[in-house]
């Protein structure tokens, strides 16, 4: 068994002269280290953070945001501009933004096939004069199967509940993104029942982005378009958290989606979804579950020298270097993408979600009825500055 270092020192230092010499050497080394450190620190150069030039942007937590590319030209106006508002994030919603439609998110389905968290139309306030659509979601593949397959006896209850909840709304949007492939026919008949019960109120259905027709696609644009009044294409998440880093919605990818969609239905059948958010990726992920040997090996490989205990339970810390890559959207990228959609003949866009945006976007994006909102930028900046003051 290896003898601890402190025990070795204690056994070797048996005579007083050796101990005295050893102590003197330690003091001398410590003084030398302090002098060297002080000298190094004394002449350490001072660097200042400056704004990077040559078209490279250095983002900072300051407002207004600094662009490396200025927006120019005319504002982009659409027939319809939708914005999604989460019922749990109402404070992020500004009812003065130039929207024609609000998607209120969301009426959920629980494990028993019951509607829960059904929002009220009044949540968006009385200032907004546009249309408000109830959005319904089901965030589980197995639960989606359970809810839309008639043999389980819950589908009728869900349809009835949604039709009752939508009475105070202007329309219903189905955002069920995890329908199993074998449930395609059940999904279409589910949509037909909803459409029949809605009467003159519009039914919109959210579908993932497609650049071509897929075999046995449960989200077939052609089949869903025969039932729904409108199709909302979620033209984002080209790259997601679990995959390689990249744009949330690159321009080339979005152009392919826009070109394909028109081969199935006319442009006025669609609402094109745009992202307000971004994502960050790292080249390393340290989260994992390990056996004792793995924990021990990891500590050794990362030069852990101290094991601490909390009421007997061991734990340690070490630092690793991570390369980070972030992709996001600002007013410039959103305006460019919106112009592309409009140029291709699309008249309706939607944003996921309100409160995540670069507020300058509302100087450039608007609807043909009310135009853009030049005051929104200043309103947003003021609100953000007030939040910063509260923190300080």
Where are these predicted regions, by residue range?
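Short, Lys/Arg-enriched N-terminal segments with co-localized hydrophobic residues
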Residues: 1-12
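Bacterial N-terminal signal peptides that target proteins for export
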Residues: 14-23
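Bacterial N-terminal signal peptides
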Residues: 24-33
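N-terminal module-boundary/linker segments of secreted carbohydrate-active enzymes
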Residues: 39-85, 92-93
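Glycan-binding loop/region signatures in secreted carbohydrate-active enzymes
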Residues: 53-69, 269, 274-340, 361, ...
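Chitinase-like catalytic core of GlcNAc-active glycosidases
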Residues: 70-98, 103-251
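Glycoside hydrolase catalytic-domain groove-lining segments
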Residues: 114-128, 243-275, 282-284, 295-310
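Conserved, well-ordered alpha-helix/loop/beta-strand core segments that scaffold catalytic motifs
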Residues: 337-351, 356-357
């Amino acid at each position: 068994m290896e003898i601890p270092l402190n025990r070795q020192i204690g056994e070797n230092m048996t005579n007083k002269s050796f101990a005295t010499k050893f102590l003197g050497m330690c003091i001398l080394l410590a003084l030398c280290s302090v002098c060297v450190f002080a000298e190094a620190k004394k002449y350490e150069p001072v660097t200042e953070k400056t704004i990077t030039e040559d078209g490279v942007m250095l983002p900072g937590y300051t407002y207004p945001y600094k662009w490396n590319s200025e927006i120019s030209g005319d504002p982009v106006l659409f027939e319809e501009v939708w914005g999604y508002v989460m019922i749990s994030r109402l404070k992020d919603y500004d009812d003065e933004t130039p929207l024609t439609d609000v998607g209120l998110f969301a009426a959920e389905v629980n494990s028993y096939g019951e509607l829960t968290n059904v929002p009220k139309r009044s949540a968006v306030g009385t200032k907004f004069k546009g249309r408000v659509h109830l959005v319904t979601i089901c965030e589980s593949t197995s639960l989606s199967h359970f809810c839309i397959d008639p043999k389980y006896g819950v589908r009728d209850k869900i349809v009835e509940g949604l039709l009752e909840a939508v009475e105070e709304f202007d329309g219903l949007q189905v955002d069920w993104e995890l329908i199993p492939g074998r449930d395609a026919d059940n999904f279409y008949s589910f949509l037909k029942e909803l459409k029949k019960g809605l009467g003159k109120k519009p039914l919109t259905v959210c579908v993932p982005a497609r650049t071509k027709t897929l075999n046995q696609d449960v989200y077939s644009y052609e089949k869903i378009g025969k039932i729904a009044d409108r199709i909302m294409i979620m033209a984002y998440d080209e790259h997601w958290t679990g995959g390689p880093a990249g744009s949330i919605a690159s321009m080339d990818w979005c152009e392919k989606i826009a070109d394909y969609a028109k081969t199935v239905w006319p442009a006025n059948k669609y609402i094109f979804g745009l992202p307000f958010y971004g994502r960050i990726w790292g080249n390393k992920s340290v989260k994992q579950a390990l056996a004792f040997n793995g924990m021990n090996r990891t500590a050794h490989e990362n030069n852990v020298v101290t094991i601490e205990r909390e009421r007997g339970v061991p734990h340690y810390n070490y630092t690793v270097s991570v390369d980070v890559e972030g992709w996001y959207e600002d007013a410039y990228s959103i305006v460019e993408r919106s112009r592309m959609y409009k140029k291709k003949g699309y008249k309706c866009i939607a944003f996921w979600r309100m409160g995540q945006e670069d507020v300058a976007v509302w100087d450039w994006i608007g609807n043909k009825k009310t135009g853009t909102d030049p005051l929104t930028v200043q309103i947003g900046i003021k609100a953000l500055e007030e939040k910063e003051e509260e923190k300080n």
